[in-house]
Amino acid sequence: MSVELWQQCVELLRDELPAQQFNTWIRPLQVEAEGDELRVYAPNRFVLDWVNEKYLGRLLELLGEHGQGMAPALSLLIGSKRSSAPRAAPNAPLAAAASQALSANSVSSVSSSAPAMATPAAAVAVPAPVQNVAAHDEPSRDSFDPMAGASSQQAPARAEQRTVQVEGALKHTSYLNRTFTFENFVEGKSNQLARAAAWQVADNPKHGYNPLFLYGGVGLGKTHLMHAVGNHLLKKNPNAKVVYLHSERFVADMVKALQLNAINEFKRFYRSVDALLIDDIQFFARKERSQEEFFHTFNALLEGGQQVILTSDRYPKEIEGLEERLKSRFGWGLTVAVEPPELETRVAILMKKADQAKVDLPHDAAFFIAQRIRSNVRELEGALKRVIAHSHFMGRDITIELIRESLKDLLALQDKLVSVDNIQRTVAEYYKIKISDLLSKRRSRSVARPRQVAMALSKELTNHSLPEIGDVFGGRDHTTVLHACRKINELKESDADIREDYKNLLRTLTT
């Protein structure tokens, strides 16, 4: 069974899956051929369990279809193809923590020459330990506090500046936003896995996944989760050396250390923390000296059992200008996508924020805002603050009419960006059909289903009435549009393909 066949099938699967699913679960897999057997390596137990439950069946189908009809012999293992000798797999704490949320059954081993797969537990491997890790340097005679220059403007709002005395003259300053906790983080389908992973790391330090890498667009909650982990670690151990910073702060500290001839003190500082939380790691791109120093710091921390949490606006392997050895190491732990919140989660976020602000927000008002502000949580909260301020200054209760007044410029922009014409064009491109097909009388499934999806999106994303939507879809009756919307809502619950299609199109149209 050739590696080339596997790669061919993976490329076919790439076309079937949303990019974030493919990047999170399939791309980290490594493969090597051992005689007639394919050995597929997952970076950790959690990825192994998820791939086995969700994707292995389809992969085997593709291998059979493109392997001259022969059932492939395949083993799914934990580890790396570069590992010389498999070792026993560690426990899977996150799988247990997230089992209720994800309904994923833990798999102790996987092997197959048919769809049902099971591998001897002894054959399951884990990544080899870090080799050739740079030793901790002794501090220089000059005292160097990397975080001393961080001003209040550089720290998050309401952040707590907190110092912990360590060996010698070094001090660790942690700028953690105390308002970012697990308790006030609104969980939904879009962030369920990320939240479970972050909680596992926070509640079981040194026994969770290391590093934890969260990626996704701006304003989706990555930084909130990172601060929540730090706050929980300090709650459990007030003397813990937890350092949060933006990647640019790390670069600035290194430059300062070089200028002061205090690079050894810099190394000692960052390699003696209990947890290092770095935001927006993509800013390391094309900064070779910074990447070199972070590479050795990262190795030293993992070798010492200290926790590392990183965030980025994209999947780590897609960060251009980042060294391959760093990308590889980021995959040693767990990499999780944080996606834009779905409608129900957006409503829940608004209701929770209103409750925290002690403001009466009617559910229909929250629903109205959530329907129109879809890109990220930050914009959602900003819109709510404008509405609350408008309500306060005008001395009026929050109603849909007041929301229209306070957000009129934002709503006008949204209406301009999301039109029925744009929806039709986007849906036609997605399903590889013509716009004229959507407007035609054709009833074949390949055309009717995309047409129903486009109608449902038009109802959700625009302010047009059902008759108006029907009119721009070839003069159809409003009852046809209503049926299409109900049908798509039903299919979103029962058909995973339609659910993913709708989510992808919604993301494309609103970001």
Curated annotation (Swiss-Prot):
Location(s), subcellular: Cytoplasm
Q: Where is this region: Disordered?
A: 133-162
> Mind telling me which Gene3D superfamilies this protein's record contains?
1.10.1750.10, 1.10.8.60, 3.30.300.180, P-loop containing nucleotide triphosphate hydrolases
GO cellular component terms, alphabetically, are: cytoplasm; plasma membrane
A Gene Ontology molecular function term for this protein is: lipid binding
Region Domain IV, binds dsDNA: list its residue ranges: 392-511
Region of interest (Domain II), residue spans = 91-174
Q: Where is the composition biased (Basic and acidic residues)?
A: 135-144
For the region Domain III, AAA+ region, what residue ranges are annotated?
Answer: 175-391
Q: Where is the signal peptide?
A: none
Binding residues for ATP: G219, G221, K222, T223
- What does the record's free text say on domains? Domain I is involved in oligomerization and binding regulators, domain II is flexibile and of varying length in different bacteria, domain III forms the AAA+ region, while domain IV binds dsDNA.
- Assembly with partners or alone: Oligomerizes as a right-handed, spiral filament on DNA at oriC.
- Record family assignment: Belongs to the DnaA family.
Q: Which HAMAP family match?
A: DnaA_bact (MF_00377)
Q: What is this protein called?
A: Chromosomal replication initiator protein DnaA
Which organism is this protein's natural source? Pseudomonas savastanoi pv. phaseolicola (strain 1448A / Race 6) (Pseudomonas syringae pv. phaseolicola (strain 1448A / Race 6))
Q: Which gene encodes it?
A: dnaA
